[in-house]
Design a protein with these regions (language model features):
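Sec/Tat signal peptide C-region and signal peptidase I cleavage site
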Residues: 16-21
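OB-fold and OB-like single-stranded nucleic-acid-recognition modules
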Residues: 22-312
Length: 312
């Protein structure tokens, strides 16, 4: 009797595990680099942990975060476009922000994301309407790519390979994060935050991620060279934008707009060192990540950054 009950319990647990082990399905070829399924792709679907809960707003946001198959030619955006997108979200009363820390973190996510879609949301100087889901691109300087925290979108995974890679993107190279114990740490952090508050955040996701998109690989790119970031336009409502030159207490990492390129599907590096010499339309100035010549690889000591605090 005891053996039968034990076998029955094991059977139920196996069935429960199978039912909650989602698979991430990719129905397109989004990357210009070779890629293949990774371990997380067999155990965490597009909805993340929220796929099996009652938080519909969280599930919807997770699904957008994981949407690799944005369509159409990439529309070129500027930092000014990203700030205008943030202002437009405020005008429309789109909810965003969060309070507290896990496990008592409360997020104010939009229940209806259709208001964020391109139609009548924001028109670029070139006359293109863009919004959440649009395929876009921007040129800027990467600042210290690093793993994010454990997130609901990645089913709470804690391994670095299973986390998003967060990249601050700015129009001119921002100061590095000063090491702990630096006598001028407070001043240097303020200067760095002021620079980041004029930029945005862009992210690679772990699903089917090409090796050159890993944090360590991206940190090997010399920060002297601008990069071209291509991917989906996404409104990350889980945070707050900066308040002037200072990050909002709940806005880590610092950014001037909650609009991101997320997920990133292409990263290329410019052979020149100024934004004016790195037009996205000039294909002769761009190099794929895995084809970088030696002089475009960082030789300076790049300080390591820890993963960000867990969000969910």
């Amino acid at each position: 009797m005891l053996r039968a009950a034990l076998l029955s319990t094991i059977g139920l647990l196996c069935c429960w595990s199978a039912a909650f082990a989602d698979e991430f399905k990719l129905d397109c070829h989004p990357f210009s680099l070779p890629t293949q399924a990774r371990p997380i792709d067999s155990r965490c679907g597009a909805g993340g942990s929220a796929a099996h809960g009652s938080d519909t707003a969280k599930r919807l946001q997770n699904e957008v975060k994981n949407a690799l198959c944005s369509q159409g030619d990439a529309v070129t955006l500027t930092m000014a476009d990203f700030m205008a997108l943030q202002n437009r979200a405020r005008q429309l009363g789109i909810s965003f922000g969060a309070e507290g820390s896990p496990p008592r973190r409360t997020e104010h996510l939009p229940q209806d994301r259709t208001k964020l879609q391109p139609k009548d949301f924001h028109t670029t100087m070139g006359g293109h309407q863009v919004g959440e889901g649009s395929r876009v691109q921007i040129v800027g300087f990467m600042n210290e790519p690093h793993p994010g925290g454990a997130e609901d979108v990645n089913c709470g995974a804690t391994a670095e390979a299973d986390k998003d890679v967060h990249i601050n993107l700015v129009e001119s190279p921002a100061p590095w994060l000063p090491p702990k114990g630096d006598p001028d740490q407070q001043q240097k952090e303020a200067e760095r935050n002021a620079a980041l508050c004029q930029g945005i955040v862009v992210e690679t996701i772990p699903h089917f991620r090409p090796a050159p998109f890993e944090a360590r690989a991206l940190r090997s790119v010399s920060r002297e060279f601008p990069v071209l970031i291509v991917g989906q336009l996404f409104f990350d409502a889980s945070h707050f934008p900066c308040e002037g030159p200072k990050p909002h207490p709940g806005g880590h990492p610092a950014r001037g707009s909650l609009w991101e390129i997320h997920p990133i599907t292409d990263i290329q590096v410019c052979k020149n060192k100024t934004l004016s010499e790195c037009s996205p339309q000039d294909r002769t100035v761009w190099t794929l990540l895995h084809e970088l010549p030696a002089h475009m690889i960082a030789v300076e000591a790049v300080p390591e950054m820890e993963s960000e605090p867990d969000e969910d």
